[in-house]
Amino acid sequence: MAVTKLVLVRHGESQWNKENRFTGWYDVDLSEKGVSEAKAAGKLLKEEGFSFDFAYTSVLKRAIHTLWNVLDELDQAWLPVEKSWKLNERHYGALQGLNKAETAEKYGDEQVKQWRRGFAVTPPELTKDDERYPGHDPRYAKLSEKELPLTESLALTIDRVIPYWNDTILPRMKSGERVIIAAHGNSLRALVKYLDNMSEDEILELNIPTGVPLVYEFDENFKPLKHYYLGNADEIAAKAAAVANQGKAK
C-alpha cells in the first residue's frame, strides 16, 4: 500500500511566546531559542530521510523563518514556497500583545483557557481604528473587509484553513508531491482537528509544541493512517505541557 507523508511544524518559540504574550496576527520574530528549535527540526527531518517538493507557510515571519531554517538544514533552501494568510495564527483580537498570565489573573484561568482553546469562543474584538487591525497592514491589502478578522475563534480559523487544505494543499499531495507546512499553533490545531475528526472537547486539550515535526501518514485515498512527532517523547510531552500552562495565572 502506497503511503503519503505530510510534515507539519509549528514555528519555533517567538519573542512573544518567550514573553508569554498573546500574538495572533502580530508579526513578531523568532527568539534565539526559536531559531535553535527550527534548526533542530530540520536536522531531525534530515536524519529521518525526509525531503520535500513543496512548502506552505503563513505570511508571518515566525513561521516563514522557521521554514527557512528547516529547509536550510535539509539543504533545500531552493524549495518553492507558497505563503498564505489562510495559514496565519488565529487572530486574538483585543488580547493581542497582552501577557497571558496577567490576563488570567484578571479574568480567571478558565476564561483564558476558553479564549485560548475553546472551539467557538472568540476573544474580545478589535475596533477598526486600532493599529492592530489587519486592514492597516499592506500584506492584507488585497483582502476584502469581510475577510479581515477583528477576532477569531478556532471554528472561524477552521473556516479559512480547511478550504485552503482541500483546494490547494491536498491536490498537490495527490499529484505526488511531498509537502511540508510551517504554520502556527491554532492553524495547525484546525487542520489536526479536521484530519483526526476530533470533537470540540478533544481539541480543547490539544497543545502543539513549538518546533517539533509532526508527521501524518495517509493511505491511497488520503485518509490519515497515523501521526507521530519526531524526537524525544518525554521532551515533546514537556513542551506541550508548557504550552498548556501559558494561560494560567502565576
Curated annotation (Swiss-Prot):
The active site is at 11 (tele-phosphohistidine intermediate), 89 (proton donor/acceptor). Pathway: Carbohydrate degradation; glycolysis; pyruvate from D-glyceraldehyde 3-phosphate: step 3/5. GO terms for biological process: gluconeogenesis; glycolytic process. One of its GO terms (molecular function) is phosphoglycerate mutase activity. The record marks 184 as: Transition state stabilizer. Keywords: Gluconeogenesis, Glycolysis, Isomerase. Substrate binds at residues 10-17, 23-24, 62, 89-92, 100, 116-117, 185-186. It catalyses: (2R)-2-phosphoglycerate = (2R)-3-phosphoglycerate. InterPro entries: His_Pase_superF_clade-1, His_PPase_superfam, PG/BPGM_mutase_AS, Phosphogly_mut1. Pfam families: His_Phos_1 (PF00300). It is an enzyme of class 5 (isomerase). Its EC number is 5.4.2.11. It comes from the Bacteria. Catalyzes the interconversion of 2-phosphoglycerate and 3-phosphoglycerate. Homodimer. PANTHER family: PHOSPHOGLYCERATE MUTASE. Belongs to the phosphoglycerate mutase family. BPG-dependent PGAM subfamily. This is 2,3-bisphosphoglycerate-dependent phosphoglycerate mutase.
